[in-house]
Structure formats: structure tokens, C-alpha cells
């Protein structure tokens, strides 16, 4: 294992495995993912721990390409992780549908990674992300206030979606000099407008409230107390709602 640096964090994933042969196969699946420094397995509990600075979505995609599925169970230290489910608040065939997910993890003082994944957007092109002052979505993204942080790197959404016909997908793994605690309760917004203006009727925008998520080893439930469904049953439901990571 290489030495750690300030960009590294740990993440745990639920991955079905039965023996050492399974773990060897998973290692092969992940060998081309940039940023992985160490991988360990708990076969009994079907858990994989990854250390490094690889985007969690890149790890999930690598497993998918090998015919396996993975569920993120926790990232980073306690109180250092967050998530935002991005919905579209417009009229038409794409009304109020999930368009993506952002996983957020703080790795160092004033350094936080954002793993942004979009899927099912109807217009191909570049999309621009920002953190907004408010988490008020009563009027969709128009009521989220001014940006408190704008990401310079756009998200290229020109790849055809592999799950939603006639739509496109894209991803970006970026960092910002912010703390996770500063973001909780605010909103994450993505728009086609390069000036991050969400009030133009001819632009496409979507967003979601930023909420805390589990840190590493903080989420060990196997059955949801609310629905009674297993972890993998919940996973299938999430995918049906376009929540893939």
C-alpha cells in the first residue's frame, strides 16, 4: 500500500461475496480504477473497505462492468459525509424525476470532494454545478437562493444513458474549500446556464437538499426498519428511481 495523503479517505461497500475466489475477482474488477490504494474484505458480512481517493461512483461502475453490484455503506470519518439527490422541478415528460446524485466527503481541513453523477437528462451538453444558500425547494431550484460556491469544471453530459431512452448522462469528481457542516441543509443545483442562473425559462436546472450521510462503519443495517426490505431489495427500488450510486 502507498502512503496516505490529504486526498485519501475510506469508504465501505456492501458487495456480495462467498469466498476468497470472490475477493480475487473483485480485486481484478478494481485494478484499473485510479486512486485506489488499499482494499480489504469482510467475507462474513459482505463488506469491502477501500482506501484512497477514487470516486465512489467509479468503484460502483467497475463492479457493474464485471457483473457485480455494490452499495456504498459509508464514506469518510463521522460527520464528514453528505449526499444530495437531484430532482428536476419542471413541467413536461421529465417532471419531478431524479436526475442524479451527489456524494460528498470531507478529506482534510477545508477540502471536500464532490462525486457528481447525472443520468436521464434530456438535453446533451455541459452542465454547471453550485451549492446554493438555501435548501428551500418550494419553487424548485428558483427558491434556493444565491450560489455560495460555484464549481468551475462543467459536467459533460453527452454520453447516452444506458438506462433511460433518449437521454444522456455524465459525471464529475471535484473538490471545494468548504466543510461538510457548512453545507448541510443547503441545496446542490445543476444547470445548463454557465453563469449558474436558475431563473431562465429556457435553461434546464435540477437540484436537491444536502443531507448528512453515514461515515465509514456507521451504517451496518441489513434490513430497513421502515420498509422491512433487505439491503438489496432497497437497492433495486433505488435503481428504479434512477438512484444508482
Curated annotation (Swiss-Prot):
Domain of life of the organism encoding this protein: Eukaryota
A Pfam family of this chain: HMA
Extent of the signal sequence: none
BP terms from Gene Ontology: superoxide metabolic process
Chain positions recorded as Cu cation 2 binding sites: 224, 226
Main subcellular localisation: cytoplasm
Keywords: Chaperone, Copper, Cytoplasm, Disulfide bond, Metal-binding
Entry's localization field: Cytoplasm
Cofactor: Cu(2+)
Cofactor annotation remark: Binds 2 copper ions per subunit.
Cellular component GO terms held in the UniProt record: cytoplasm
Domain HMA: 8-71
Cystine pairs: 29-66
Gene Ontology molecular functions: copper ion binding
Record-linked InterPro entries: HMA_dom, HMA_dom_sf, SOD-like_Cu/Zn_dom_sf, SOD_Cu/Zn_/chaperone
Chain positions recorded as Cu cation 1 binding sites: 19, 22
CDD domains according to UniProt: HMA (cd00371)
Summary of the function given for this chain in its UniProt record: Copper chaperone for superoxide dismutase 1 (SOD1). Binds copper ions and delivers them specifically to SOD1.
Family recorded in the similarity comment: Belongs to the CCS1 family.
UniProt name for this protein: Superoxide dismutase 1 copper chaperone
Gene name in the database record: CCS1
Amino acid at each position: 500500500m502507498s502512503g496516505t495523503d490529504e486526498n485519501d479517505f475510506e469508504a465501505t461497500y456492501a458487495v456480495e461475496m462467498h469466498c476468497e475466489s470472490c475477493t480475487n475477482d473483485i480485486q481484478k474488477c478494481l485494478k484499473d480504477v485510479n486512486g485506489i490504494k488499499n482494499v480489504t474484505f469482510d467475507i462474513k458480512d459482505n463488506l469491502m473497505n477501500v482506501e484512497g481517493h477514487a470516486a465512489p461512483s467509479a468503484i460502483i461502475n467497475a463492479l457493474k462492468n464485471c457483473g457485480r453490484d455494490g452499495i456504498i455503506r459509508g464514506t469518510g470519518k463521522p460527520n464528514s459525509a453528505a449526499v444530495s439527490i437531484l430532482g428536476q422541478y419542471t413541467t413536461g415528460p421529465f417532471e419531478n424525476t431524479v436526475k442524479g446524485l451527489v456524494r460528498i466527503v470531507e478529506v482534510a481541513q477545508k477540502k471536500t470532494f464532490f462525486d457528481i453523477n447525472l443520468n436521464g437528462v434530456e438535453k446533451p451538453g455541459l452542465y454547471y454545478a453550485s451549492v446554493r444558500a438555501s435548501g428551500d425547494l418550494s419553487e424548485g431550484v428558483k427558491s434556493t437562493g444565491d450560489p455560495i460556491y460555484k464549481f468551475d469544471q462543467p459536467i459533460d453530459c453527452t454520453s447516452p444513458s444506458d438506462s433511460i431512452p433518449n437521454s444522456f448522462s455524465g459525471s464529475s469528481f471535484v473538490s471545494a474549500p468548504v466543510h461538510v457542516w457548512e453545507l448541510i441543509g443547503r441545496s446542490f443545483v445543476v444547470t445548463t446556464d454557465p453563469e449558474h442562473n436558475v431563473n431562465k425559462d429556457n435553461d434546464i436546472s435540477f437540484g436537491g437538499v444536502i443531507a448528512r450521510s453515514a461515515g465509514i462503519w456507521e451504517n451496518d443495517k441489513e434490513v430497513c426498519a421502515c420498509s422491512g426490505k433487505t439491503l438489496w431489495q432497497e437497492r433495486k427500488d433505488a435503481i428504479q428511481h434512477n438512484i444508482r450510486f
